[in-house]
Design a protein with these regions (language model features):
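Hydrophobic/aromatic residues within transmembrane alpha-helices
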Residues: 61, 69, 73, 127-128, ...
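C-terminal-most transmembrane helix of multi-pass membrane proteins
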Residues: 14, 21-27, 74, 280-314
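Membrane-interface helix termini and inter-helical loops of multi-pass transporters
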Residues: 56-66, 95-98, 129-132, 174-175, ...
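Membrane-interface interhelical linkers
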Residues: 2-46, 79-111, 161, 213, ...
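Helix-helix packing/entry segments at the starts of transmembrane helices
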Residues: 137-142, 209-219, 257-292
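C-terminal transmembrane-helix exit sites in multi-pass transporters
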Residues: 142-162, 284-303
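Hydrophobic alpha-helical transmembrane segments of multi-pass membrane transport proteins
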Residues: 45-53, 57, 111-128, 190-201, ...
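Glycine-/small-residue-enriched transmembrane alpha-helix faces in small-molecule transporters
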Residues: 2, 6, 12-71, 168, ...
Length: 314
């Protein structure tokens, strides 16, 4: 009996396609395992770069508010994901997984992480235009380390001395920031405190990332439409009368799906520890964009706090 899954099929097809491209010798030399590793690293870098672009994207969609951009992004992402699955012929594979859920308890368990997902995507679009860019980036810096802690506590994973040292540096950095500001940003806490819960729940459910994403977006789509009709009808007129906004929102949806797709493929190709380390590229980009592009304030006293966090990451 074949042990191929939809994700394995997708990964194998991608690897086979890449192998036919005229790539540099370093990409094609070595064993198949080495080539897969190189391709996984490339996809991880691409996905993190795309997420960095998406973080600054909302600043180019003024006068839409951060919440309105979030609503439009969810709808554009849903449409782009459905289009991708239809064109690739994989929609049926994901629907078959959902058809296997036959009880209310199974569906309730499946939908439990959805509010966390939606709140995280809202914060991702709201923070850059509301002065919370640096604080949100700090949450993403802490997210991988929080995953290590959750893995240790919930799954009995063992930490090496270096990993404990990294967690310690990050903890001191966060503590320093709390002392400096005499508070801690709710955006930082929300990212590092709830996003790991989302991934842990999806892991326990054993559902693929694309299937989970399809469920999350489909459930939210009617609420997004209702919001535009009854709460923010002005944004409908603004978007509908502007080819610029239509193209920008279409690009937002396609970039979002591409970012998620490359991220999922990278997670299938890379060892867990390598994939985890690659995930630090995104918060570094978010932090830089928050300061340079979005104009969020950065005080010299923050160097100590963030320096300790970066030291833990290194």
């Amino acid at each position: 009996m074949s042990n191929l899954t939809p994700s394995n099929v997708s990964t194998n097809m991608l690897t086979a396609t890449v192998s036919r491209l005229p790539l540099p010798a370093v990409w094609t030399a070595g064993s198949a395992q080495q080539r897969t590793l190189i391709m996984g690293v490339a996809l991880a870098i691409l996905s993190n770069l795309l997420f960095g672009v998406l973080y600054a994207y909302s600043s180019f969609l003024a006068p839409l508010s951060g919440t309105q951009v979030f609503i439009w992004r969810m709808l554009a992402m849903w449409a782009a994901l459905i289009g991708y699955l239809l064109i690739s012929g994989r929609l049926g594979l994901h629907l078959d997984k959902l058809k296997a859920l036959r009880t209310v308890k199974q569906w309730a368990w499946l939908l439990l992480p959805t509010p966390i997902f939606l709140s995280q995507f809202w914060l991702f679009m709201w923070a850059p235009v509301n002065g919370q860019g640096v604080q949100t980036a700090m949450g993403y810096f802490l997210f991988p380390l929080m995953m290590v802690v959750f893995g240790c506590v919930l799954f009995g994973e063992k930490l090496s001395r270096l990993q404990w040292l990294a967690v310690g540096f990050a903890a001191v950095g966060v503590g320093s920031e709390i002392v400096r500001t005499q508070s801690v940003s709710w955006a930082t806490l929300w990212v590092c405190g709830t996003y790991p819960v989302y991934y842990i729940l999806r892991r326990l459910q054993g559902i693929g990332a694309i299937t989970g994403l399809l469920v999350d977006l489909t459930i939210f789509a009617p609420f997004a439409v209702a919001y535009l009709l009854f709460v923010a009808p002005s944004s409908l007129g603004l978007v509908g009368s502007s080819s610029f906004f239509i193209m920008m929102l279409a690009g937002l949806g396609m970039l979002s799906v591409l970012a998620m797709k490359t991220n999922v493929d990278a997670s299938q190709m890379l060892p867990v520890n390598v994939y985890g380390m690659m995930s630090y590229i995104e918060p570094a980009l978010l932090f830089i964009l928050a300061i340079t592009v979005l104009g969020n304030p950065f005080e010299s006293a923050m160097i100590y706090s963030y320096g300790l966090i970066w030291l833990g990451i290194a």
